[in-house]
């Protein structure tokens, strides 16, 4: 992933079987990276392989270019060697690696599995420093999470983020179906949550809000079904209308993960889907729910990915083919989850899971997790999740990790 030192990003990708790895970057001029895809070719920076399988690009600038100017003349070009890679840049990894499913060496261009932020529709990762104070809305920063005295006193309300406000006419149209709908104090939905909190409800369980693979993130690209006015209640017209726009509508429960550690862009307001802008809006939601007296639990789906192999919606398998997914006796990806099963029993797959859970607590201040199909994960993995959270302290991290509530879907298979 990306880390920061002195405001400068460094990059690392674990790809032990790769023959070569190159970082592709586009400078945005915005430390928060809240801009659409930057046009033009990227700057190419070869990564250095370490003995542990990581390919690394540190935060130090390249040696100065001989001329200090772009080939076309004029001011220095930040996409040319000699200029540092800066906070807010957009980036992709180019990985040259042997792919068993195609029996040849492929050159894959992929987003970062550890992405903290993304451009709209997840076309590029964005190097955002989650510690940047400009990403900290006041209510989120200053409102502590409410306490739940013990787990037996917990009352949980499961809620789909978009459904909460998509049809609520008391919410401004531009905020409907978004993170920021929770900040509209006078809306019908927020008033209802406040009343429930007064009655004793203390926890909101949000259906998946990580980066989802199949929801168009541009509002203008989303289609809604048009039900014929004269359709009989028992006709097939309604189903046909829904099926016609199924690939382009905004309705999705969200159980098709693309990036586990970044917020979903379709739930951001229009014009705020890129980079750090969606981070701010997610935090605004958490702050507003805390202010209502409600803890926030995230529904996390680590048991499968949206795709595998060379599929365009496959990230992990294009970086380390055959590692992140659970295979059967002949090498095929298993799908008992109804999708491509992950192999969290593998050390670096487990670490990706653990690290993203810690990120959501430390940098978004969520209060718990519900794990989808938890039985598909080894017990030791869940114990490691618990142990990693328990290490977070108010003094060092601003949160008490021991108070984070964990539970999982209890189906006994996998």
Mark where each language-model region is.
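Polar, glycine-rich mid-to-C-terminal structural blocks
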Residues: 404-414
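Structural beta-strand segments of beta-rich domains
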Residues: 7-11
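The feature marks proteins involved in alpha-glucan
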Residues: 1-6, 33, 37-43, 52-54, ...
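Substrate-binding/active-site clefts of carbohydrate-active enzymes
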Residues: 162-167, 171-183, 191-364, 373-374, ...
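Beta-strand signatures of extracellular beta-sandwich domains
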Residues: 22-24
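Short proline/glycine-enriched turn/loop motifs at strand-loop junctions of beta-rich domains
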Residues: 14-20
